[in-house]
Amino acid sequence: MLIPVVCFTCGFPIGTYAAIFDKARTEYIKTKMGGTLPQNIPLDASLQIELKDLITALGIPMRVCCRTHLITTLDYRKYY
């Protein structure tokens, strides 16, 4: 699924920050997985990776609705 260009609720331009967040998310997931890509290890249902603080750490000024769109959109081709 693609990240929307603007937030459906408030109209914030999410698309301008999508590439920055995607790169940071990939690196964050790789560090949480021990330096390997998720496609190279078996799926573990108990693994929890919190992404809510990643947007704050990047300094992206977003509301909760925008964070929901950005965090829940995942391009499965990169990980599976």
UniProtKB/Swiss-Prot annotation:
Pfam families: RNA_pol_N (PF01194)
Gene Ontology terms: cellular component: DNA-directed RNA polymerase complex; host cell cytoplasm
Amino-acid positions noted as binding Zn(2+) in the UniProt annotation, renumbered to this chain: C7, C10, C65, C66
Gene Ontology molecular function, alphabetical: DNA binding; DNA-directed RNA polymerase activity; zinc ion binding
Gene Ontology biological process terms in this record: DNA-templated transcription; viral transcription
InterPro entries the UniProt entry points to: RNA_pol_su_RPB10, RNA_pol_suN_Zn-BS, RPABC5/Rpb10
Location(s) in or outside the cell: Host cytoplasm
Sorted UniProt keywords: DNA-directed RNA polymerase, Host cytoplasm, Metal-binding, Transcription, Viral transcription, Zinc
Signal among keywords: no
Assembly and binders: Part of the viral DNA-directed RNA polymerase that consists of 8 polII-like subunits (RPB1, RPB2, RPB3, RPB5, RPB6, RPB7, RPB9, RPB10), a capping enzyme and a termination factor.
UniProt function note: Component of the DNA-directed RNA polymerase (RNAP) that catalyzes the transcription in the cytoplasm of viral DNA into RNA using the four ribonucleoside triphosphates as substrates.
Entry similarity comment: Belongs to the archaeal RpoN/eukaryotic RPB10 RNA polymerase subunit family.
Name of protein: DNA-directed RNA polymerase RPB10 homolog
Native source species: African swine fever virus (isolate Tick/South Africa/Pretoriuskop Pr4/1996) (ASFV)
Taxonomic placement: Viruses, Varidnaviria, Bamfordvirae, Nucleocytoviricota, Pokkesviricetes
